[in-house]
Amino acid sequence: MSYRNDYLYLREKFDPKAEFITLKKFRMNILNTPFESYNYDILPGEEHYHCQTHDVSFEESYTLDSKISAPHLDELLKIDDSRIEENIFFTYPIFKSFTLKKSKEVIILLHGLNEKSWEKYLPWAHKLVEYTGKTVLLFPTAFHMNRAPASWADPRFMNKVCKERKQFYPKVTNSSLANAAISTRLQFLPQRFIWSGLQTYYDILQLIDQIRAGTHPHIHKDAQIDFFSYSVGSFLAEIMILANENDYFKNSKLCMFCGGPLLNRMSPASKYILDSEANVAIYSFFIEHLEVELKRDKRLAHYFSDLHHIGKYFKSMLDYNKMITFRENRLKKIAKRISALALQKDEVVPSIEVELSLHGHDNKIPIKVKSIDFPYPYDHVIPFPISEKDEKEVDKWFAKSMKFIAGQLK
């Protein structure tokens, strides 16, 4: 079958509410597996915070509103992040070959920023199972996919949000219904970027805890765990491999697709990702004024300190020209387990920035980076179009891309 036909078939078959989906054509099953996050109390919205590891307490210091007369913006902002149930109780899909045995080899797939549906990733997961023989687990980032309130994807509500953004910020660019929710939330509280990232980080550790304890219904307790990541999912995956919490990822491989650069080497302003106001807010907070902001935000400063090495690795991945020795020495140690596939016409994650970030300032980090240019119209968000016009070329290059990725994860 063609990529297009596979995509349409999987889109029709996939139901995130169905516990078990049989794909007879591929001799695979999709298992939508329930998960309860125990890490939501790190998010904005709590009155008091406590770091159990270091027995340190903090008070909430964020104001969750826009401070302007914009009812729909405020509806998005005044909600307590830590109380959003969809982000605590959710399911994640597992692609698994026909077998009753628990999987001993698993690839965790991490998606891009502002994703609301698994549709794009279904053919990717299917091909990785086919080419590697491994199980593929698609894990959603906090407030993405099925971890967000339905209203954030409601066209009528988002249209009102979008109009308010343009009213108060007439110079905004790349504003759209697709990115109105995430742009609003990150513009007014850029710290959400790190807190939701940390929740996802700890959720994945919780998942690994479950696997290692032997209580996961579909994955063997001694399973090899690798990562395939796309876009900003690569930012998180890379940090996880760098930090190697609990020694869980000492043997894990990571292959990144359209991902890999440091934060200040990416350009996420897009109608599908972030609008210009949110992009500027993120850059201003994490790149230009981070040290000043950390003096104001004691809890964030605690998690960015040497006491939490996840925070230190996150900090090291923000700016290409800072923490160079710390970051690149660690990358050199894990280089043989990391690889990347970059696209030359990618304007969000430019291929040259993937190479510069992963090869280091001295160009001596031996991370494998392959840069290609598809012979059909594509971009970062849609690398494999489903139109009939270029169907044969898309089939060819999708297969080549997935075979390269699978080869790095075998």
Task: Please place each PLM-identified region on the residue numbering.
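Low-complexity, serine/threonine/proline-enriched polar segments
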Residues: 16-39, 44-53, 142, 160-177, ...
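N-terminal cap/lid segment of alpha/beta-hydrolase-fold proteins
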Residues: 21-102
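Phosphate/oxyanion-binding active-site loops and adjacent basic polyanion-contact surfaces
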Residues: 84-88, 193-204, 390, 394
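Short, surface-exposed "cap/lid" segments of acyl-processing enzymes
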Residues: 93-173
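Alpha/beta-hydrolase active-site loop
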Residues: 154-218
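Active-site loop->helix "elbow" adjoining a glycine-rich segment at hydrolase catalytic centers
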Residues: 196, 231-234
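Hydrolase active-site cap/lid region
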Residues: 215-230, 238-308
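Serine-hydrolase catalytic core
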Residues: 277-410
